[in-house]
Amino acid sequence: MAEKKKSSLNGNRKIERPSGFLAIIISFLVILSILTQLDLKPNYSNILEDLSFLNENIIRLKINAFIWLINAILIIFLGPSVLMTFLPHGRSSSYLAAFLISATGILYLLFTANCFNIISVVKEYIALVDTTNSFLPSLAFNLLITRTNLQMIAYTLTGISAIVLGSLFARTGYLPRFIGWMSIIGGLIYIAFGWFDPESLVFVAGRVIFVLSLLFFGSYLLLRGTINRKSDIINPPEN
């Protein structure tokens, strides 16, 4: 009986452990990015105040940009890692999940590049002696608008990725189903509130649920691994 239960565990632990460790690192980096982010609603009439605010918090902005640079690269690698983890189970949805995850990482790379551009513009503007006819405020405003749009699109891609990956767990039980349902709920909130009300308590709750699902996902992959349900069907436990 013990041998049959043991045989139901997926043996591809060399892939599962790094995937789990990667997901755990990403979850903690997401938390750090939330704690260091600067929320600005771009308004051209207040752009000079925004530039002053960004200059006062330039170190925090740099830290946030570097966190997202590292996290974006890790998210890109998480895509193929998820594919290699779940493809042996014969699920084609793992292709879609891997594509969406890597696409989210690429989008966050663009977001990070935008953040570094904002930092450069802020430094150049503050260094000016005469700012009367400077084009930098207009450039900064456009960069802030782009930053906001990239963030909203990233919320949507994150939500779709969470729903696709969560549905895989919820339907198959390769990982505990509660992780799948947490991922689905967090993903739905990301999509529904990311564009319209990202400052609401509901969206904050959705982010907490999503990060916890990612942390549980990584922990189970790292410590226990997936469960191969096919072997249980082919070789049902003896009474």
Per-region residue spans from a language model:
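Hydrophobic, aromatic-enriched alpha-helical segments typical of multi-pass transmembrane helices
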Residues: 2-239
